[in-house]
A protein has these predicted regions:
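Macromolecular interaction modules
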Residues: 1-103
């Protein structure tokens, strides 16, 4: 495993205020731990916008962007998704997801 990765996954979104508690519980208790269990994911951090939006940002450092093509990631983001994940993701608004590679 490398000391730092060459890939970043950034995900931004808004959630209606009445769903924020559930969203934050899901992110902290289920989603980030699931992602961090995937080989090649190195760090996962969450941020809240001080102003502007989208309000929520998650940044995942990966060994490389190719991790997103791995069977483990494809399973976790496909048929391995929980009902809770489907529910929370279905409430997301202004969803932005970008993958970056170090230059």
């Amino acid at each position: 495993m490398t000391e730092h990765g060459t890939g970043l996954l950034l995900v931004m979104m808004d959630i209606d205020p009445e769903h924020e508690d559930d969203f934050n519980r899901w992110y902290d208790d289920e989603h980030v731990p699931e992602r961090m269990a995937i080989p090649g994911f190195l760090t996962g951090r969450r941020y809240r916008a001080i102003e502007g939006g989208p309000k929520y940002l998650a940044i995942y450092e990966m060994e490389s962007p190719e991790i997103l093509d791995s069977p483990a990631y494809k399973y976790a983001s496909g048929q391995g998704r929980s009902e809770w994940t489907a529910q929370v993701v279905g409430r997301a608004k202004n969803y932005v997801r970008n993958v970056y590679v170090e230059m």
